[in-house]
Structures are given as C-alpha cells and as structure tokens.
Swiss-Prot record:
Record: transit peptide: 1-42
GO function terms (MF aspect): alternative oxidase activity; metal ion binding; superoxide-generating NADPH oxidase activity; ubiquinol:oxygen oxidoreductase activity
Comment field (misc): Unable to fully compensate for the loss of AOX1A when electron flow via the cytochrome pathway is restricted.
Cofactor note: Binds 2 iron ions per subunit.
EC class: oxidoreductase
Major location (coarse): mitochondrion
Gene3D superfamilies for the chain: Alternative oxidase
Keyword Transmembrane: yes
Organism: Arabidopsis thaliana
Record gene name: AOX3
Name this protein carries in UniProt: Ubiquinol oxidase 3, mitochondrial
One Pfam family it belongs to: AOX
Chain residues that bind Fe cation 2: E186, E237, E288, H291
Family that this chain belongs to: Belongs to the alternative oxidase family.
Length: 318
C-alpha cells in the first residue's frame, strides 16, 4: 500500500483530530506522519522556533538576520527513513512515494475508430519521425526530451479544468488532481534521468523550443476539443511505452550500461537499495502505461457525450 493510500484512509480520522485539538498545518502533518509506517518525525513543533539540528545548514534570513521559515511559522520538519538516515528530498515526501503496478499491459493500443482518433494518431506518428531520426538509439537523451514534453498535457489539462471549476462554480470530480498528479509524476521521471546524464547545450535548446511550441499547441487543442487533446496524449504515452521497451531491450543486450539506480529513484518508487537503471526504466514504463490508459479513458468519456466530472477520477493511479 502506498503512503498516499494510507493518507486517504486516515484523512477522516486525522481531520477530526485536527479540528478537536486545534492543531495547525504543521501539527497536522506531524500527526499524519506518526501514523505512516517506516517513517519517523524528529520535529513537528510549530508553536516555537526551531533551533539546533532542525535548521537547514544555510537557512534563508531576512535583512535583520531572522530565519524566514521560523518567522512565518513554517519550520523545517526532519523525517528519517527506516535505516535512520535523514529524508533528504524537498521535491517529494514519503507519502508521495509508491510501489508501481508493473503488471499493467504495456502492449495495449487504442485502435483509431473515427476522424478525431485518426487525426490524433497520425499527428503523433508524424511528430515521432524527426525525433527518431535525431536520437536514434541515444535513449537517455531521448528520455529527457520525452519527459519534458510528457509533463505538459497533465499540467495544461489540470490548469484549464481548474479555471473551468472556478468559472462554473462546480466540482471537477477529482480530475484536476488526477491530471496534476500525472504532470508531477512525469516531472519526477525527468528529475531521475538528470541524475544520470546532463543534457548538452543544443539539447537544452531543443527542449526550450519544443516545450514552448508544444505547450501552446496543446493549450489550444484542449480549449477547442478536450477529447482530441486527451487522445493525442494517449497516443503519445503509447509511443513513450514503446521507446522505454526499446531502452530495456538495449540494456538487456548489453548495448547500454546498466548502472546503479539514483537515490531519488530508489526513494520515489521504493526500489531496493541495489536497484539498477533497468529497474528504473521498468517502473517508468509502467507509469507511462498508466498515463496512456488515463488519457484514453478521459477521451472515451467525452466521446460518449459526458463530462469528466461524471466519471470517477483516477487519483493516485500508478
């Protein structure tokens, strides 16, 4: 069970505890962490300044020397892992980590059945041609470009649904959170790969250009036809699954070094300490397959004439 699932189970109980005890945000977080397995909270007291070992090595201070986090009542909380070492990541917390469902079918394909489907499918097929010609078997570079693009659809969709929810004074059915989770998960893929390889200047230039063009194009597509946008993303994720399958084949064939997994990957996907690059690519491929299903699912809902809020949102779906 993931920390996120545990949180959803405990949330009603903890919420009532917060209301009855008057705990603040920091106190609530400490109360939550105390219920999580294999996680130990060293300090969560927000009622008094944090001092000593609970302060970061170089805290940000105001002009008169006050530590900003303490001044605003948001002191850092120290969390330890089961082996006693400190949790060192600020970009995600223990309850954001999870064990991926690697049993998902990675060969599933949505067969285009109408004009919109065919347009989405051939758009993706056309876009992948220059990418394949440029990267060929340079899997790490290809993966980094792929993840900078793959993190865009969830953010755009979540943002537009957020604005729609505010504009219409109605709930989104959980789809805002689901799509933003997808975007964050894709970003974590990128953060993992940059631990293994740094892009060259021209690759950064390509990312800058491609991301700018794709963000605006996808934004317009989502405004005009969300079902088309989700279908495009579904096919993009199918290609992502295929590219990671090729990556795995080359690792298995000895064409790409199976180096140790970076620490961030071990903590994020709760991998064993001796995990390798192959293990990382394997779980990332599973993530992409889940994103594929989410977006084809979202498109199918809208093709049937329904709004996303009418169907259960796949929150925490990995």
């Amino acid at each position: 069970m993931s920390y996120r699932s545990i949180y959803r189970t405990l949330r009603p109980v903890l919420s009532s505890s917060v209301q009855s005890s008057g705990l603040g945000i920091g106190g609530f977080r400490g109360h939550l962490i105390s219920h999580l397995p294999n996680v130990r909270l060293l300090s969560s007291d927000t009622s008094s300044p944090v001092s000593g070992n609970n302060q970061p090595e170089n805290p940000i201070r105001t002009a008169d020397g006050k530590v900003i986090s303490t001044y605003w009542g948001i002191p850092p909380t120290k969390i330890t892992k089961p082996d006693g070492s400190a949790w060192k990541w600020n970009c995600f917390q223990p309850w954001d980590s999870y064990k991926p469902d690697v049993s998902i079918d990675v060969t599933k394909h949505h067969k285009p059945s109408n004009f919109t489907d065919k347009f989405a499918y051939w758009t993706v097929q056309t876009l992948k041609i220059p990418v394949q010609l440029f990267f060929q078997r340079k899997h790490m570079c290809h993966a980094m470009l792929l993840e900078t693009v793959a993190a865009v659809p969830g953010m755009v969709g979540g943002m537009l649904l957020h604005l729609k929810s505010l504009r219409r004074f109605e709930h989104s059915g959980g789809w805002i959170k689901a799509l933003l989770e997808e975007a964050e998960n894709e970003r974590m893929h990128l953060m993992t790969f940059i631990e293994l390889s740094q892009p060259k200047w021209y690759e950064r230039a390509i990312v800058f250009t491609v991301q700018g063009v794709f963000f605006n194009a996808y934004f317009l597509a989502y405004v005009i036809s969300p079902k088309l946008a989700h279908r495009i993303t579904g096919y993009l994720e199918e290609e992502a699954v295929n590219s990671y399958t090729e990556f795995l084949k080359d690792i298995d064939a000895g064409k790409f070094e199976n180096s140790p997994a970076p620490a961030i990957a071990i903590d994020y996907w709760r991998l064993p300490k001796d995990a390798t690059l192959r293990d990382v690519v394997y779980v990332i491929r599973a993530d992409e397959a889940h994103h594929r299903d989410i977006n084809h699912y979202a498109s199918d809902i809208q093709f049937k004439g329904h709004e996303l809020k009418e169907a259960p949102a796949p929150i925490g779906y990995h």
